[in-house]
Amino acid sequence: MASVAHISTAKAIFRAGGLPCRRLITPTLTGLPLKTHRMNSTTPTYHLIPKGGKHGEFRQESDTFGPIQVPAEKYWGAQTQRSLQNFRIGGEKERLPLPLVRAFGVLKRAAASVNREFGLDPKLADAIEQAAQEVIDGRLDDNFPLVVFQTGSGTQSNMNSNEVIANRAIEILGGTLGSKKPVHPNDHVNMSQSSNDTFPTVMHIASVLQIHTHLLPAMKHLHRALKGKEEEFKNIIKIGRTHMQDATPLSLGQEFSGYVTQVGYGIERINNALPRLCLLAQGGTAVGTGLNTFEGFDVKVAEKVSKLTNIEFKTAPNKFEALAAHDAIVEMSGALNVIACSLMKIANDIRQLGSGPRCGLGELILPANEPGSSIMPGKVNPTQCEALTMVCAQVMGNHATITVAGASGHCELNVFKPLLAKNILSSIRLLGDACESFTDHCVVGIEPNYEGIARHLRDSLMLVTALNPHIGYDNCAKIAKTALKNKSTLKHEFVTLGFGTPEQFDEWVRPELMISAKKV
C-alpha cells in the first residue's frame, strides 16, 4: 500500500468565525502534489486494466435488477453500466470532473481505514485502501465514464466508485471480477456510507483542494503582478475618467491600486468562505441521522481525510443541513462570482486604456502575443483581456446555475449535487487558469505610453477643477465650456476672460498636486 502522508506540524492559514479550515504543511494526496490533480491534469499513461480483460469482450455482472453485460477491460459493475445506458446525455464532455473522481478515492480510502477500526476485515480494508489510492493516483480514470446528468444525489457515481474499487480490490486479493467476493461494493467499500452523505463530502473535498492548489496561487500571482505595476507606475500622472468622460487627474499607480485591492478582497472572500467547505457531511448517511454508521465514524473520517490531503477538514456539526442544503457551495460560488465581476472590470479597463494604437485612448501598451486579424495586416488585439472577460461571463453563468441548484433541496435531500459539483469546479478551474494566463501574458508586460498619457492630461478640460477654490464653480464651468467651444486651452480662456494671470494659472493648476487631499 502507498504510505499515508502523516502530519508533523500544523499551521493555520484560514479561519473565519471559529470554523475550521487549515492547510497543514503543503496539500498533497499521499505525497503527490495536488497541482497534478487539476481538472485538466493529464492522466497517467499506465492505466490499469483487469487481468485478461480484452477490448470487445464482456463479463457478466449483476445487481438487484439482475444480470448485465459489462466490458471486460473495465472495472466498473452493473450499476455503472445501467447508468451508461439510462443517461446518455451530453457525451464524454459532460463526464464527472476528474477532481471529483480523485476526491472519491480520498474518501473511500479514509472510510476503509476507519471501518477497519469498526470491524471491517483488515485484509479487505488494505485491499480497498490500495485500490482507492490508485483512484487518487489517476490509474483508474478511464473507469469513471458517467455524466453529470444522472440521479441528483450522485448515487450512480458513488456506486461507480464502489464498483471500481471493489473489483480492483478483488483482483488484488486474487478473486474473480464481478463476483463481489471477497469484496462487496455496498457491504465493504460503501460500509457506513450513503450516496447522500458521500457525494456532498467529495464535492467539498474536491472544491477545497482545487481552491488551495490552483485558484488561490493563481490569484496571488495576479495580485503580486498588479502590485508591482502599482509601484512601477506611482509617479505617472494621468487623467481620470468617470462616466467614460474626462475627470480629474490621478496617478497610474493609483489606478492600478484599485485593481490590486479588488483582487486582494477576492482572495479574502475565498478565505472567508472556505471554512464552511471544510465541513464534511460524511456520517449523516441517508437523511442525516447516521443510521447504519458508528458513533465517532464521522469525526474519524474527517481526521483521516485531513491526513491524506494535508488540509484540515471537520465533520459538519449538523448533518441534516449538510445533506439537504449546499449553502457552502452557493456561498463559495458567490465569492467566485464577485471575483468574476472584479476581473471583468479590470480586464475591460486595461483593454480600454490600451486601445489604439493611434485612434484609441492609447495610455497603456499591451503585450503583442499573436496576430490579431486574418484580413487586417499588422493588427494586434487585447486577446488576454478578451479571454478573461469570457471566463468571467461563464463563471457568472455557472453561479446562476449553482444558485438554482442550491435552492432546490427538498425535505431531507438536495438532488442537484452533480450539477453543483460540475459548476463550482468549472468556476474554480476557469478563474485559476485565466488568472495565470492574464498575469503571464498581459499584466507583467504592460507598459505606459508616456506620450499618450501626457497629451490627454494636457488637453483635459477637467483640470479646471483646481481653480474651484480660487474663482468658484460657476466661473470654472464658464472657462471649460468656452475652451471647448473655441477649441482653445484652459489657460488661454482663464486669462482672456479676466480671471487671472498666466502665472496664477500655472501656480494653481498643477496636476501633481491634484492627486491627493490637501494637507492641513
Swiss-Prot record:
BP term (GO), one: DNA damage response
Keyword vocabulary terms for this entry: Cytoplasm, DNA damage, DNA repair, Lyase, Mitochondrion, Nucleus, Transit peptide, Tricarboxylic acid cycle
Predominant cellular place of this UniProt entry's protein: mitochondrion
EC number, UniProt record: 4.2.1.2
Single GO molecular function: fumarate hydratase activity
CDD domains for the chain: Fumarase_classII (cd01362)
UniProt pathway: Carbohydrate metabolism; tricarboxylic acid cycle; (S)-malate from fumarate: step 1/1
Active site, per annotation: 243, 373
Binding residue positions for substrate: 153-155, 184-187, 194-196, 242, 374, 379-381
GO CC, alphabetical: cytosol; mitochondrial matrix; mitochondrion; nucleus
Entry-linked InterPro entries: Fum_hydII, Fumarase/histidase_N, Fumarase_C_C, Fumarate_lyase_CS, Fumarate_lyase_fam, Fumarate_lyase_N, L-Aspartase-like
Transit peptide, residues from-to: 1-39
Coiled coil location: none
DNA repair in keyword set: yes
Location in or out of the cell: Mitochondrion matrix; Cytoplasm; Nucleus
Class of this enzyme: lyase
Catalytic activity: (S)-malate = fumarate + H2O
Site residues by UniProt (Important for catalytic activity): 386
Note: There are 2 substrate-binding sites: the catalytic A site, and the non-catalytic B site that may play a role in the transfer of substrate or product between the active site and the solvent. Alternatively, the B site may bind allosteric effectors.
Record family assignment: Belongs to the class-II fumarase/aspartase family. Fumarase subfamily.
Assembly information from the UniProt record: Homotetramer.
Its biological purpose: Catalyzes the reversible stereospecific interconversion of fumarate to L-malate. In mitochondrion, catalyzes the hydration of fumarate to L-malate in the tricarboxylic acid (TCA) cycle to facilitate a transition step in the production of energy in the form of NADH. In cytoplasm and nucleus, involved in DNA repair in response to DNA damage: following DNA double-strand breaks (DSBs), translocates from the cytosol to the nucleus and promotes DNA repair by catalyzing the dehydration of L-malate to fumarate.
Record-given protein name: Fumarate hydratase, mitochondrial
Species of provenance: Schizosaccharomyces pombe (strain 972 / ATCC 24843) (Fission yeast)
